[in-house]
């Protein structure tokens, strides 16, 4: 009831929608359902500590409009588990642990074009669900040396931001302080599976939009969005499909 009242008050104040991160399932469902009843839109970064309780398929069924990143999407396609296969010493608050294990997630989901993979994709499309991909921020994990030495940083990235980007145990997502070829290989393979899903989602009529999530991991505003468009092209989008994701489909989503 408190969640429903909160959503109604949010609408009364003139909000266009709500950005969610996660909540206990009963509260999350009530808020999503009421938000949709009121004709408002919704977005969600599915917090990794909540996806075992509410993955993307479950939030979409309850009225979620769009998702960001990929959190909660592979989890919806698990066939032999309900929680990612974390090592026993995993510590979510350790950024190195968090992002190293994130690079091993997509291979734990159903294989591309398998029944489970197809069923999840087709249901999301039937729900008119939008995926806002944000390929670019995580691309640093495929090649840290390249990402940290891109030519525009010298002239366009503020010194304070460059300092924040340096490998660190404190700065969010600057997780490459103990990084090497094995992690980068995992992430390259992770991207292949992620991009396969996104490209096929688009091919079947699903709405995909471009988002940069700049401000972290050598991902700078302005430049990051162009990189995102390039990564959609890498995923298999035709150049016109890339432009549509950044324009028409983005407008439809909001």
Name every feature range the model reports, one short phrase each.
Residues 238-250:
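Mid-to-C-terminal alpha-helical segments outside catalytic/metal-binding sites
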Residues 1-3, 251-254:
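Short, intrinsically disordered, charge-balanced linker/junction segments flanking boundaries
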Residues 2-5, 241:
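An acidic, carboxylate-rich microenvironment
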Residues 6-17, 73-230, 234-235:
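Active-site neighborhoods of metal-dependent hydrolases
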Residues 28, 52-54, 77-78, 141-142, ...:
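Short secondary-structure boundary/hinge segments and terminal tails
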Residues 1, 15-97, 108-115, 211:
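Active-site loop-helix segments enriched in His/Asp/Glu that coordinate
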Residues 7, 28, 32, 51-56, ...:
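Generic hydrophobic/aromatic pocket-lining and core-packing "Φ" positions
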